[in-house]
């Protein structure tokens, strides 16, 4: 009798261990408002997404992660840019918002049996352009930047590892974009910047 009870207990424990899924991650929230508004001497601010559609094979890898890269770029514009003038138009144009997955070659041989190799590279590229037209004194100009980043994933990466890799990639790209766009705006659009933190 005790042998049957022991066997049943072991089966229950094994089943419980097999079904242990990683705890779901909290939704990723990108908040650029804490960085402060960049007030521009224009009356209107708009957003345009001209990014080409990514290859189908890459869409399938990234489509379920939130926020999507183009949504994060839009959020940056809403949180950071403010039209505070009486004339002129500012347009934040997304030219590229691309994420790609590449397979990495794996080593073979006995040594490879005991190491967890990096099997995938996820790469991201963003190009944005802030265009100013018809501002005071008929000022027209633009500030643009391109950001590229990548991260690797180990072989047989689980769902949590993949989600964390996406978050790392997205967060690092957006931090780079913020820094580079601030610099580009100071260099090329200084005459229409009213205030910048």
Regions found by a protein language model. Name each.
Residues 1-6:
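Bacterial N-terminal signal peptides that target proteins for export
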Residues 13-16:
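C-terminal motif of bacterial Sec signal peptides marking the signal peptidase cleavage site
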Residues 18-21:
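Bacterial signal peptide processing site
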Residues 25-46:
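Post-signal peptide N-terminal segment of mature Sec-exported envelope proteins
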Residues 39-103:
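N-terminal segment of the mature soluble domain
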Residues 43-55, 135-162:
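Short acidic, glycine/tyrosine-flanked loop/strand segments centered on an H-E-D-like triad
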Residues 88-142:
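Surface-exposed short loop/turn segments
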Residues 157-197:
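C-terminal/domain-edge helix-coil "capping" segments
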